[in-house]
Each structure stands twice: as C-alpha cells, then as structure tokens.
Amino acid sequence: MIISASTDYRAAAQRKLPPFLFHYIDGGAYAEYTLRRNVEDLSAIALRQRVLKNMSELSLETRLFDETLAMPVALAPVGLTGMYARRGEVQAARAAAAKGVPFTLSTVSVCPIEEVAPAIDRPMWFQLYVLKDRGFMRNALERAKAAGVTTLVFTVDMPVPGARYRDAHSGMSGPYAAPRRILQAMTHPAWAWDVGLLGKPHDLGNISAYRGNPTGLEDYIGWLGANFDPSIAWKDLEWIREFWDGPMVIKGILDPEDARDAVKFGADGIVVSNHGGRQLDGVLSSARALPAIADAVKGELAILADSGIRTGLDVVRMIALGADSVLLGRAFVYALAAAGEAGVRNLLELIEKEMRVAMVLTGAKSIGEISADSLVRELGA
C-alpha cells in the first residue's frame, strides 16, 4: 500500500490488525457522535491564506516544560500500544525521540517504564489515572521518577469507564471474547507471528510490576474497571502535586471553569480533551471547546489539545485556536501498527511537511505567529 499522506495509515492498520485491536483504537463511546465531530469540526475550520510574505525562513521549534520540541507535537498516552506492534511502546518512543518530540507512556502500557525509558535519549512523559488503589499510584510515580520521567500527565476524565459498544461487537469484550480474539489472530498471521508470538510478554508491565504477577487483557479490564474512582476531587490530587516536583499536566479538560480550577490547583498545563470521543458521547469536540478555554487561562499554564488531530493542518488549526502544543493518539498507533517504528517516524515527517505547507501559505514564520488571525472569520460570525 502506498503511504502518501498521514491519513493513509488508518487503512494500512486495518489490513494488518485483528478486528478486535483495530476497532479498539478506532472506536469511541456509545454511538460515536463525538468521535466523528472531533474530526469533522476540526477539518471544517478554514485557514486564512496569505501570499508574498517571504517565507524562506521557517521554524517549527517550540519550548514546553523546559524542553525544546522540534515541533509542537507529542505522542499521546495510548493503552495497549504494545499490542499494535512488537514491544510497541519502545518502537513509538524511539520514533518520537528521533524526531525530537516527547513520547507519553500510558499507565496501561504493555512495556513497563523500566523498559521504555532506557531505550531513548530524551526525557519521557508518563500518564497516570486517578485510581482507588493509591498504593499503585504512588508506586508508579516513584518508578517514573527513578526512570527519569520529566512530565506527569494526569488523566482526570475517567472516573468511570466509557460505554464502548463497538468493543463488544469486535471481540475486545462481550460474550465469547477470548475465543473470538484467537480466531481473529489466526486469520492475521503476520500480526500473530510478529506481535502475538515474538512480542511477548503481553501483560501490562506497569501494573504487573506492582501486583507481582502478570496482568493480562482479561485481568486488565477487571482490575482497571474496579479501580476507577468516581469520588475523586481536586483535594485528592494535592498529595500528588506535593510528591511530584516536575511539570504536572491535567488531561481531560473541556470547560473553562475546570481550566481555571487547574490554574488554582497549581497545574503546569492542561490537555483540552474528550479522550478521543471514548468517554462521554455528545460532549463538545476539542476544537469547539478550545477557544473558550484559551480565553480563560491562556498564559497562566500551558494548553495542549488532542482528539481529532490527524494531519499537520489539524495541528496548525489547534495552535490557531489557542493550543501551545498537541498530542497525537490514534494517528501514531495506526502508523505503528502498519509499519512499526519506521511508520511512526514517517508519520511525524508527514505531519511536519503538512505543517510547513500550512504555515508558508498562512504567513506564519514560527509557531508563535500562528494565531486566530491564521483562520478565516466566517461570514456573520
């Protein structure tokens, strides 16, 4: 299959993956309205073309949390990444490091912190959920510190699991899920050999290290579901702010009031996010939520955004709407599934090229020059 655009990797991933894995990363919650709106709302935003601006010198570099990024992009935390390619978290982290952007390791990764951090030569970020098992949270934070993790991404939009109906149809969950997954793997021999066999162990490394025994897919669903904490409030995060002395980012903000609360709490950044449409269907897309949040807290902390970003044009749109940087989730997992580390490297190159074209043709010579003026004000607005 020819890969000429960043969006080509989705079809390539679908060909290679067993359906339960493809639909797990591709799907959203309930009827998936928010999942679709994330992409549609963002792609509908018109960029303002400018010409004859002498764009011979162009820089995508940006500073974020005392790090220099080659472009305002980081790889988002995605659970089970190691099921999409052999030791997938390591491959994705290497690709990000080679490009000069951060990789964020998920709490529920296949590869543990201690395997991923030594594989790269730049600081890594780590994502943590709010869980009832505070002992696990403290253990994960201590291990992240010991591994040299610089930035903590704290996910707060999962006090309860979202209803992901597609998973029951695909075999990720639901009746006879385990035998259905085995049958699907048998019909995808390339994945079964490369990941299913050579990619072992498939337990969730960060959780297994704490529990002292392998935590596989079935255990993961049960353990994580039992540990979500709907009682969580800002005061429950104070011990983490005291324990973690590096940058702390709150992920899952969609409302300006919550963004203001994050400032009061002392967060270093927020991620405007609806969890990729995987939690509450019917909420605002990140693109629609971002401008009001930027108006409320811009300059008081770093604003990142995710959900719906598929191309370099989308990155430019999010920056113009008020983000300082973005997180790529599904986009990099598609590339990883299709072509491993090389696929993620190529994806990031394509994202950069698309950003450069957009910046040249909107007259923005640096990331700092991308603003609301880079967008077309709709008639009647």
UniProtKB/Swiss-Prot annotation:
Function recorded in the entry: Catalyzes the conversion of L-lactate to pyruvate. Is coupled to the respiratory chain.
Origin organism lineage: Bacteria, Pseudomonadati, Pseudomonadota, Gammaproteobacteria, Pseudomonadales
Topology class, membrane: Peripheral membrane protein
Keyword Membrane: yes
Required cofactor names: FMN
Record-stated family: Belongs to the FMN-dependent alpha-hydroxy acid dehydrogenase family.
Protein known as: L-lactate dehydrogenase
GO molecular function, one term: L-lactate dehydrogenase activity
Active site: 275 (proton acceptor)
EC number: 1.1.-.-
GO BP, sorted A to Z: aerobic respiration; lactate metabolic process
Binding positions (FMN): 106, 127, 155, 251, 306-330
InterPro entries from the UniProt entry: Aldolase_TIM (IPR013785), Alpha-hydoxy_acid_DH_FMN (IPR012133), FMN-dep_DH (IPR000262), FMN_HAD (IPR037396), FMN_hydac_DH_AS (IPR008259), LldD (IPR020920)
GO cellular component labels: plasma membrane
Keywords carried by this UniProt record: Cell inner membrane, Cell membrane, Flavoprotein, FMN, Membrane, Oxidoreductase
Localization of this protein: Cell inner membrane
Primary localization class, coarse: membrane
Oligomer and partners: Homotetramer.
Source species of the chain: Pseudomonas aeruginosa (strain UCBPP-PA14)
Pfam families per UniProt: FMN_dh (PF01070)
